[in-house]
């Protein structure tokens, strides 16, 4: 397929909704993660050794999240995509109120690591589903969207830190997660409506 043919997918409004949803969701996760080490030291008051251990736990949990997401996306993709932003919002709220408790934050980071591993699969699935006829280009768009989300959210979360302190960095994550809900549900509604029409 020629480059010109692949670029035509950019005229699809559904692709743009999907890209915005992915930008927001990835931003929610990695905007906060960008400041996690500092958060663990200054808010949770973990020692340097425990910060390293906690970050390792986060990374290993990503692997488990990938496995879980693979199964759920193959079984009940729309339900999983729909509930994910709410789960992440709840986790950030728990982190907001209990993040200053050392061992509690390690448990929160474990669960968050699993969710972040899931998000990588959700993001790629969401864009690929809309642009399934141009898989290579869809993968490139996925990488662009996730990187843009990380950059924008890290900047926004930095503003929250400047204004409200490092302990409120998760407010930036909550903002991005809540905004993503509308875009994901617009996509889910479109897909569900299309499937209902096909079944008639």
Residue ranges and their predicted role:
Residues 59-67, 150-151:
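Residue-level signature of mid-helix packing/kink "hotspots" within the transmembrane helices
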Residues 77-123:
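C-terminal transmembrane helical hairpin of 12-TM major facilitator-type secondary transporters
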Residues 174-200:
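Multi-pass alpha-helical transporter architecture, strongest
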Residues 14-56, 60, 77:
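Extracytoplasmic gate region of multi-pass secondary transporters
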Residues 46-55, 101, 105, 135-139:
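Juxtamembrane helix-start elements in MFS-like secondary transporters
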Residues 129-168, 172-176:
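A late C-terminal transmembrane helix in Major Facilitator Superfamily
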Residues 1-19:
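Juxtamembrane intracellular "pre-TM" segments in multi-pass secondary transporters
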Residues 64-77, 161-162:
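Helix-to-loop junctions at the C-terminal end of transmembrane segments
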